[in-house]
Amino acid sequence: MMKKTILVTGGAGFIGSHVVRLFVEKYPDYHIVNLDKLTYAGNLNNLKDVEDKSNYEFVKADIVDSEAMLKLFQERRFDGVIHLAAESHVDRSISNPTEFVFTNVIGTVNLLNAAREIWKDNFEGKLFYHISTDEVYGSLGEEGLFTETTGYDPHSP
């Protein structure tokens, strides 16, 4: 029996696939559900090495679909969420900001609402991690680095 069921959104993306692989391999008694819309940034080939693991499951879905998200949460009863699904390419944010708002804002709200709905009677032990992008810090010069205390300085929608 699996100890916990964890949802990873955007799990077929660059960072998400690394997170999925880490959890599948490090926590064999956890059920890892990878939810991805498989847009230009998602690629299931990133996860060929874990696709047949018994504790791994892929779900193709869009976090903007609030009904689908609530149904998925009700069926799987997630113990935790690692939310990486996002539109993050700056050039695309300039040419189509509406798509970014739907995915990054509405999609995140849909996940939070679904989590709240199934966790409302007992939040104990439940975790929701929202992963952002380094783009919120703006541009980095030739030297230096961003830290936990770096202020936000976004330059794109």
Label the model's feature ranges.
Residues M1-P157:
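N-terminal Rossmann-like NAD(P)+-binding domain of SDR-like oxidoreductases, especially those catalyzing
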